[in-house]
Amino acid sequence: LEACPVIAAPQTASGEMLALSIAQGAAELGGKTVLPLSFAMSRDAAVRAAGYAHAADAIAPELDAGRNVAMVNLGDVSIYATAYYVLDELRRRGYDTRMVPGVASFSAVAAALGRSLTEMELPLHIYPAGASDLDAALAQPGTKVLMKSGKAIGETAAALSRHGLAEDSAMVADCGLPTQQVFETMTGLPEKISYFATVIVPDSKK
């Protein structure tokens, strides 16, 4: 980040750039050119693709001028990351790209809970927001990670209860932020939880 003269940062409709704010606490970014990038929160693949192309359109002139661009991202760029799709679009256009690993959100959540994500010989399953068949997912062996569960917290908690997993599952919302909330169990939850809520579900046989 400090080596690149230009920083690309996702921006919400309200103007917030959370990933940039976090990065500013870890690196000296004074004097950088900041490119705010807006992305539609849509399940329509065509709408999302248009957003990634628009972001690449904003970044490409900087690269053409010989200026390296770093795009900040929440979590790790290889895991359900908007930044990766922008990178992929730029790569298709012939630009050199590089991925820098970050701390995956679910790894940070596991650390906040003091839990391991894996056990010997058992798999780890990672599910994005709105996974189509949560009941089938919860029946799988091993630990389950349910990412960005805040919008469907009621449905998630109900599914965990049906499988007898609510007491042993845990959740962290806004992990690492001043607004962080830790829930050691998935019972008695408030009606509204931050979108950035990750649930850790232990192996169903435990």
Residue ranges and their predicted role:
Residues 2-96, 183-184, 188-189, 197-198, ...:
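Class I S-adenosyl-L-methionine
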Residues 9-10, 37, 100, 120, ...:
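Generic beta-sheet signal
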Residues 13-14, 130-132, 150-152:
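Short beta->alpha connector loops
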Residues 14-16, 42, 104-107, 153, ...:
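Short gly/pro/ser/thr-enriched loop/turn and capping motifs at secondary-structure boundaries
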Residues 34-36, 97, 126, 169-171:
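Conserved beta-strand scaffold positions in the cores of enzyme catalytic domains, especially
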Residues 38, 73, 128-130, 148-149, ...:
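Short, structured patches in soluble enzyme cores that scaffold and shape functional sites
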Residues 64, 138-206:
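A contiguous loop/helix-start segment that scaffolds small-molecule binding in enzyme catalytic cores
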Residues 75-140, 190, 204-206:
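Class I SAM-dependent methyltransferase SAM-binding "motif I" and its flanking Rossmann-like core
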